[in-house]
């Protein structure tokens, strides 16, 4: 049950990922064999639920790619369910301050360190109590990544970085650029300056900086600055643009798409 993704971040080994938005175990398994270090199963902006997350975790399990799951909110009940079906690494959205980061960590820990409910006899995570001493080992294998996506969160970053149990901080460029007044333009110089400063600050604090960006030049720039978990594409975008390009080569008139974060 060792969390190899958490171990890689702790060792300072950059992890390259892909975002999964199709909410399909079939496509998740297809992409699990593509060679990415991690795959993000998105529960915030897709029609995923606990059941569909479970089937994607099962589909990815035989492959080297490590799953990361984003719940729809920093909700301890939802987090408990996601952990019980086998999630070990969580990306918690819209964390604004240290108290919210602390709540996210507590939701992943069994008492007395946290508030995770004990239901291991019902849980895939413990292999239905077939993993020896699961309740004693589980806390140490949980990896908590929190998202900062607003100016308020950026202001509170030093305090968030001080929270014990936060393994990494993920910068959300789409929401951050919108909050800064540049919606749809994460490449604006002010947004980029904030992102770069945050990456350096997170790494200097001994935490893992992360981000999603489909621009390869920017992705490489963030890695150079010290980012440790970088998603470089989204399955929905890859499929849509490839299909449009193929159709266009045979004369189809595709709808113009403005380049964005993904």
Curated annotation (Swiss-Prot):
EC number, as in UniProt: 4.1.2.52
Annotated catalytic residues: 45 (proton acceptor)
Coiled-coil region(s): none
Increases basicity of active site His (site feature) positions: 84
Residue sites binding substrate per the record: 147, 174-175
Alphabetized UniProt keyword annotations: Aromatic hydrocarbons catabolism, Lyase, Metal-binding
Molecular function as annotated in GO: 4-hydroxy-2-ketopimelate aldolase activity; metal ion binding
SUPFAM superfamilies associated with the record: Phosphoenolpyruvate/pyruvate domain
Gene Ontology terms describing biological process: 4-hydroxyphenylacetate catabolic process; phenylacetate catabolic process
Pathway: Aromatic compound metabolism; 4-hydroxyphenylacetate degradation; pyruvate and succinate semialdehyde from 4-hydroxyphenylacetate: step 7/7
Binding site for a divalent metal cation: 149, 175
Cofactor mode of binding and number, as noted: Binds 1 divalent metal cation per subunit.
Cofactor: a divalent metal cation
Record GO cellular component, one term: cytoplasm
Pfam families given in the database record: HpcH_HpaI (PF03328)
InterPro entries listed in its UniProt record: Aldolase/citrate-lyase_domain, HKHD_aldolase_ent, HpaI, HpcH-HpaI_aldolase, Pyrv/PenolPyrv_kinase-like_dom, Pyrv_kinase-like_dom_sf
Catalysis: reaction(s): 4-hydroxy-2-oxoheptanedioate = succinate semialdehyde + pyruvate
Function summary: Catalyzes the reversible retro-aldol cleavage of 4-hydroxy-2-ketoheptane-1,7-dioate (HKHD) to pyruvate and succinic semialdehyde.
Assembly with partners or alone: Homohexamer; trimer of dimers.
Family statement drawn from the similarity comment of this UniProt entry: Belongs to the HpcH/HpaI aldolase family.
Protein name per Swiss-Prot or TrEMBL: 4-hydroxy-2-oxo-heptane-1,7-dioate aldolase
Organism name: Shigella sonnei (strain Ss046)
Taxonomic lineage of the native organism: Bacteria, Pseudomonadati, Pseudomonadota, Gammaproteobacteria, Enterobacterales
